[in-house]
């Protein structure tokens, strides 16, 4: 038994230069844990509350001194004296103390910082790597990465409608090889853009946002880059994309629109599904995220019924890492995968519960970063601890993204012959892929 003796939070900066919460936690036997909390730009309507100060004279209102204050006062008083290894009890203590359904009193950014710092301190206390402390001796599966190399939608100034275009090294034999394949394809894509006279500046997640006209051109460019890097599209490297459909849905008319490429064009849910199906039939696509609006549950049913056997369908804004929404989706036969974002729900315990529920229902789980990241590498350890099998952590640039890939390679080296990279077999619940 090792008792928590001190908890300290401070305001630091994330990868966008915006304030975020950092927490340090200490135990009586010398255990130490530090965690930094990420932040999303496009957030789901039902996510846990990220508490900001609202003081326009500091960071344009984005300061987090209120959240920091809650950690250093109410939360610290509540968790000091607890056994640092009692993760569920620590998390539940904070949830009860907050007393709101969405962590609106203290902020998920305050609560999550303490939750993660406690786990790190406990791992330090017992002398184990974080992934092994959290996952035990069976933590051994290295994830197949989703690498966001091209951006559109709200993440860019071009006229591409879908928000993220990703490559997945499904044919790699190890995470180290997957990272190399991704890096080589990223640089091949950069060379192609330069040859076309297009911009090669990168966005928040390290991907390019060139002046492309539509989704079709983005998919074609990725296929060309994969070939240029010396790989076979589909066999070696497959494609994935995030539609971010809520950005293009009109609830009143129940229609979708190609908001950026052709805003006058309207689609019913069936027509929208057929449009996406056309891309999936034409290109080596294995995964699609948020293809339907987060509140259009009937639309999700329609999409899943048609597409569920041929592609991974990931719910992000739909599920917001929340077991209540995930259970509803499972009961309704909606999606077949969940995106896992720690700060959407706000504690490590609740994150584990969402992953467990997904697996029990035959859904895959994709552990994900946020657009506002830090040097914190917890998600790399989490994805191995849970044997989730897939990770979404940005492109092959920007240190805040690369830090996670580097940590995965370290973990793979530590595991040695015990490690397993599943690649294409990560999509175990999709008949047309596995």
Curated annotation (Swiss-Prot):
It comes from Lacticaseibacillus casei (strain BL23) (Lactobacillus casei). It comes from the Bacteria. The gene is eno. Gene3D superfamilies: Enolase-like C-terminal domain (3.20.20.120), Enolase-like, N-terminal domain (3.30.390.10). GO terms for molecular function: magnesium ion binding; phosphopyruvate hydratase activity. CDD domains: enolase. Pathway: Carbohydrate degradation; glycolysis; pyruvate from D-glyceraldehyde 3-phosphate: step 4/5. Its cofactor is Mg(2+). Mg(2+) binds at residues 242, 289, 316. It catalyses: (2R)-2-phosphoglycerate = phosphoenolpyruvate + H2O. It is found in: Cytoplasm; Secreted; Cell surface. Disulfide bonds: none annotated. GO terms for biological process: glycolytic process. PROSITE patterns: ENOLASE. PANTHER family: ENOLASE. Its main location: cytoplasm. (2R)-2-phosphoglycerate binds at residues 163, 341, 370-371, 392. It holds the Pfam family Enolase_C. Binds a second Mg(2+) ion via substrate during catalysis. Its EC number is 4.2.1.11. GO terms for cellular component: cell surface; extracellular region; phosphopyruvate hydratase complex. The active site is at residues 205, 341. Keywords: Cytoplasm, Glycolysis, Lyase, Magnesium, Metal-binding, Secreted. This is Enolase. Belongs to the enolase family. Catalyzes the reversible conversion of 2-phosphoglycerate (2-PG) into phosphoenolpyruvate (PEP). It is essential for the degradation of carbohydrates via glycolysis.
